[in-house]
Amino acid sequence: PMKKHEMVLVFGKSASYYKPQLTEGTPYKRKWTPNKVNNMEYGIAGVITDNKGTRHPTTILDFPQQWRRQDQLHPTQKPVELAKWLIEAFSNEDDVVMDNCMGSNTTGLACKELNRQYIGIEKDKNYYDVSVSRVLS
């Protein structure tokens, strides 16, 4: 109840790959002067930072659900756009993505759209059947 954060765990064979999925914000220019105390001699006249409005994501990713409650296939179903965002941030095309609690198979649908290989695990036979038919349709 009243939870703002839900954990997303990312595992890989080697050091994590991360390609930031930047969000849109207000463009800005910022001027700053380096500190002489820290032995920063270059740019004493000031450095101008020009940003077109892109921002790194915060800890809250806002993806509205795209279904009515009565159409929900699984109690913890996530939006496909959220799965796509995460998959694009942490994998490349043809990489293998595994979801060990696949539920309604949102991750599988996103992988199919993004050209990733996919391994899904679900212990509940009913949810497994629903998820397989969902990704095959």
Q: How should each PLM-predicted stretch be described?
A:
Residues 132-137:
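Short, conserved SAM-binding/catalytic segment
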Residues 1-130:
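Core catalytic lobe of class I
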